[in-house]
């Protein structure tokens, strides 16, 4: 319970009563209260308490004020309180009922303000079942008395007693239901009351844990409790009459579940991994292991202590590490961590509750794996004091020597990787050392060409060190040194020209045979006494030759600055110098001839063609000059007209505009349209000057008002060249040949088509209403024809041959016809096909011949034919019903048919 110093003692009793009633109705204060947050602190202890044993921890709330609070116990002979609120036993003694309850006081050192809290200590339950309490031993909780009115003011009477919380150990073995307290109202003497409890654990989940006898008010627990699930139950007790009317205000009943040490500590990880650099000093932090206990952390059951059970390996000391028993921090306690000897340590860590009490505490273990990390405590060391190598001269990017070192540090780490450098013997920087990342070897490499004639041997001083500096306190030198002897091998080198290119200045127009200069190549291998010969490699204009022995260059043609092979007045030629070494080597040199201009080109008129009108007005011709020479052998130019022929100066006049341009105009008033060649004399400014008569083709044409030639004149004036005319004629001839070939091909195709039509089966020739009677159904049933009957019979007597008369095909025959009729007028071919073909040819040759020659015999259909006689087929109508006069218009071949159908009764 807490008391506020300087409380409102001067306030009216009514205000105090109202304020206290309001606070009790709300159940809690909204503002922070200085003091103990709990009304009662409880702990479960063994029967025997040892001296110095921590019992529990009480907390004090300062409300964020910097108060200096001093604790003291109401039983100082048995208990003391530390500054952090931990309660210790002053002496060893068996815990009795008298010592199970005491008070703890907290006093502000500055204001002397004082607070107190009750402490209840409970004995651990024995393994045997607790005996049932006698009825007279059951505690009672009586409802407080109601407020009474005195003199018009409310006044609360004192309670019979303060309702303390009920402490109930977890995991109780019963028997159940186990009686706790009896709830009673002092009005049960006059009324018949009924008691009940509400809240979590009674009528709210988890329901049925606490029950009350409605008549006697006996409150009981029905099952063992588990503090790790619910540490406190808050119930409300009610008292009503038999009609259900409330008799007493509900009272709060708090049931604290007293913690039992029923949970072992559990590590957050079964295996913990940490690391520490080798060579670390004692006290170096390594890692932290953490375990948790589900029991009450404010009681001994949840207070853990750590310790190291074992260390493997145990070298160089079995106790290389220690652990803070409260925080779990692992630190080093001994020197001598060396990764090259021991790379990893394995520790077995134990966590025990009850503050590490080995007798009562529960424990658990975990593994801590500590890796010793590498530091640079071993410098690289060369495996030899001197290394040897050789390199051909003028070679670069060649590995000369391979430097090897040893390093005991962890491979492929900055403490193991070697860095090489050349500390002496290479003032010009011709060598470099690269590090092989796999083997850590140093590769001595040539980075600049070496001349054998200048340096035949190098002695290099090299050093090797790690990428990171050595760790502090290491006695070894930070680097290792060695020497490298490099021998240079002589090789045949290329001859070279100096200078290259060689530039000379000469005037153009030099005659052939003129000696220009001498190209001389140098041989770097002066100790080999080799001969050099010269050849021409590139001479675009073929103007030069070179002496193969002494390198003299002579012209073989006239040098011309205006040649297309000369660029910017410079002519380039390339020559080759070769020695007779083994193997032979060669080098190239370039000769650049800067050609000086002379006045060797006469100027020409530009443009070479122009047009003007028939009259002097309204336009004129502007001309200029083209000279391939350069100043001072070019412009300014002089323009003039020649004296002959006389018509030139009579018809034309020229006026100089400036040094580069002149103007040509008609001198006469009218010049007939046409093309005129006007010679113009142009003179340059060379010394001596050079003149030229250049022809300007001028087209004189009719002009419009704007001074432009009309289209008619342009068309008339346009001329075709001979080549163009020949090409046009060739195209016309080829076109005519193609047309002729196409006509011949068409004629030939028509003849072939006509010949094929003569052989067309009459079945395909259907004209108007001409019917075909040679088709009698789905084909002949008898396919065994006697082809000999279709041939000319030789055994028939002449008097037996009876001519066949011409008759209508749609009329029944009047008399019986012979079975095998024979054409008497037919020749005697051996096959009926030949007979038909000959008849067709005769009809084609004689257009006036009647068509009966092509009549076929249809009355023989083979032996055994089931077809009836064709004469049995009657026409559906008489011949007079139809008009067949149009058959006369079909030509001679249908004349017979026209007579048969169009001749009436005849």
From Swiss-Prot:
Ca(2+) 2 binds at residues 170, 228, 259-260, 262, 295. SUPFAM superfamilies: Cadherin-like. GO terms for cellular component: adherens junction; apical part of cell; apical plasma membrane; apicolateral plasma membrane; basolateral plasma membrane; catenin complex; cell junction; cell surface. The modification Phosphoserine is found at residue 96. Glycans are attached at residues 190, 273, 325, 402, 572, 622, 651, 692. Keywords: Calcium, Cell adhesion, Cell junction, Cell membrane, Cleavage on pair of basic residues, Glycoprotein, Membrane, Metal-binding, Phosphoprotein, Repeat, Signal, Transmembrane, Transmembrane helix. Residues 746-906 are cytoplasmic. Residues 863-883 are annotated as: Disordered. Residues 1-25 form the signal peptide. Homodimer (via extracellular region). Can also form heterodimers with other cadherins (via extracellular region). Dimerization occurs in trans, i.e. with a cadherin chain from another cell. Interacts with PCDH8; this complex may also include TAOK2. The interaction with PCDH8 may lead to internalization through TAOK2/p38 MAPK pathway. Identified in a complex containing FGFR4, NCAM1, CDH2, PLCG1, FRS2, SRC, SHC1, GAP43 and CTTN. May interact with OBSCN (via protein kinase domain 2). Interacts with FBXO45. PANTHER family: CADHERIN-2, CADHERIN-23. Three calcium ions are usually bound at the interface of each cadherin domain and rigidify the connections, imparting a strong curvature to the full-length ectodomain. Calcium-binding sites are occupied sequentially in the order of site 3, then site 2 and site 1. This is Cadherin-2.
């Amino acid at each position: 319970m807490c008391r506020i110093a300087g409380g409102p003692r001067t306030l009216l009793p009514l205000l105090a009563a109202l304020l206290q009633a309001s606070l009790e109705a709300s159940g809690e204060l909204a503002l922070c209260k200085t003091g103990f947050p709990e009304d009662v602190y409880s702990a479960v202890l063994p029967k025997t308490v040892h001296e110095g044993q921590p019992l529990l921890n009480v907390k004090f709330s300062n409300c964020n004020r910097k108060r200096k609070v001093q604790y003291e116990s109401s039983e100082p002979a048995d208990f003391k309180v530390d500054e952090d609120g931990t309660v210790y036993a002053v002496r060893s003694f068996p815990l009795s009922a008298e010592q199970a309850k005491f008070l703890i006081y907290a006093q502000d050192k500055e204001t002397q303000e004082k607070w107190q809290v009750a402490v209840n200590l409970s004995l651990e339950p024995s393994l045997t079942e607790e005996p049932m309490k006698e009825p007279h031993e059951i505690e009672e909780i009586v409802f407080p008395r109601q407020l009474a009115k005195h003199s018009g003011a409310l006044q609360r009477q004192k309670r019979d007693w303060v309702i303390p919380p009920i402490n109930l150990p977890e995991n109780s073995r019963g028997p159940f239901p186990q009686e706790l307290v009896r709830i009673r109202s002092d009005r049960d003497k006059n009324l018949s009351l009924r008691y009940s409890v509400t809240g979590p654990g009674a009528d709210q989940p988890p329901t049925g844990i606490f029950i009350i006898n409605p008549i006697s008010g006996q409150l009981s627990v029905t099952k063992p409790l588990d503090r790790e699930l619910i540490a406190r139950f808050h119930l409300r007790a009610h008292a009503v009459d038999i009609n259900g009317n409330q008799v007493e205000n509900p009272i709060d009943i708090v049931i604290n579940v007293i913690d039992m040490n029923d949970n072992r500590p559990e590590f957050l990880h079964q295996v913990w991994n940490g690391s520490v650099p080798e060579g670390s000093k004692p006290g170096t932090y390594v890692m932290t292991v953490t375990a948790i206990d589900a029991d009450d952390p404010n009681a001994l059951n949840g207070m853990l202590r750590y310790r190291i059970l074992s260390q493997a390996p145990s070298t160089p000391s079995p106790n290389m590490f220690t652990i803070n028993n409260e925080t779990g921090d692992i630190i080093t306690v001994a020197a001598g961590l060396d990764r090259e000897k021991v790379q990893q340590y394995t520790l077995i860590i134990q966590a025990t509750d009850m503050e590490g009490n080995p007798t009562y505490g529960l424990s658990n273990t975990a593994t801590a794996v500590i890796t010793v990390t590498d530091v640079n405590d071993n410098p690289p060391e060369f495996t030899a004091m001197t290394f040897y190598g050789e390199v051909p001269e003028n070679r670069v990017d060649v590995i000369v020597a391979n430097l090897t070192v040893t390093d005991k540090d962890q491979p492929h780490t900055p403490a193991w990787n070697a860095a090489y450098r050349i500390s002496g013997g290479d003032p010009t920087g011709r060598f470099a050392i690269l590090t092989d990342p796999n083997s850590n070897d140093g590769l001595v490499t040539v980075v600049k060409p070496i001349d054998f004639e200048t340096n035949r041997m190098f002695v290099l001083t090299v050093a090797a060190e790690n990428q990171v500096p050595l760790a502090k306190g290491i006695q070894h030198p930070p680097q290792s040194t060695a020497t490298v002897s490099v021998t240079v091998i002589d090789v045949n080198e290329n001859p070279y020209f100096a200078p290259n290119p060689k530039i000379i200045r000469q005037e153009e127009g030099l005659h052939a045979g003129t000696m220009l200069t001498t190209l001389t190549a140098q041989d770097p291998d002066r100790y080999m006494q080799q001969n050099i010969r010269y050849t021409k490699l590139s001479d675009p204009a073929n103007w030069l030759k070179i002496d193969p022995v002494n390198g003299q260059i002579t012209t073989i043609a006239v040098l011309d600055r205006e040649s297309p092979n000369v660029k910017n007045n410079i002519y380039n030629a390339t020559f080759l110098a070769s020695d007779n070494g083994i193997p032979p080597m060669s080098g190239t040199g370039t000769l650049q001839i800067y050609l000086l201009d002379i006045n060797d080109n006469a100027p020409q008129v530009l443009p070479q063609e122009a047009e003007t009108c028939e009259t002097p007005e309204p336009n004129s011709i502007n001309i200029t000059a083209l000279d391939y020479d350069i100043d001072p052998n070019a412009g300014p130019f002089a323009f003039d007209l020649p004296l002959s022929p006389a018509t030139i100066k009579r018809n034309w006049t020229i006026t100089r505009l400036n040094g580069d341009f002149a103007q040509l105009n008609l001198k006469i008033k009218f010049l007939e349209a046409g093309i005129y060649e006007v010679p113009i004399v142009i003179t340059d400014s060379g010394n001596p000057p050079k003149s030229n008569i250049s022809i300007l083709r001028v087209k004189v044409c009719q002009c419009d008002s704007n001074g432009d030639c009309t289209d008619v004149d342009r068309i008339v004036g346009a001329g075709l060249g001979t080549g163009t005319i020949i090409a046009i004629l060739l195209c016309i001839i080829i076109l005519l040949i193609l047309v002729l070939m196409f006509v011949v091909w068409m004629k030939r195709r028509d003849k072939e088509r006509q010949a094929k039509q003569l052989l067309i089966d009459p079945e395909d020739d259907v004209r108007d209403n001409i019917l075909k009677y040679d088709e009698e159904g789905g084909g002949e049933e008898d396919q065994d024809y006697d082809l000999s009957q279709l041939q000319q019979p030789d055994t028939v007597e002449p008097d037996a041959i009876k001519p066949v008369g011409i008759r209508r095909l749609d009329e029944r025959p009047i008399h019986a016809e012979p079975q095998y009729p024979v054409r008497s007028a037919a020749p005697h071919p051996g096959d009926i096909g030949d007979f038909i073909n000959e008849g067709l040819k005769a009809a084609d040759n004689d257009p006036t011949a009647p068509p009966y020659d092509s009549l076929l015999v249809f009355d023989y259909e083979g032996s055994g034919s089931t077809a009836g006689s064709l004469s049995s087929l009657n026409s559906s109508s008489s011949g007079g019903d139809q008009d067949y006069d149009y058959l006369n218009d079909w030509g001679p071949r249908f004349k017979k048919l026209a007579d048969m159908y169009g001749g009436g009764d005849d």
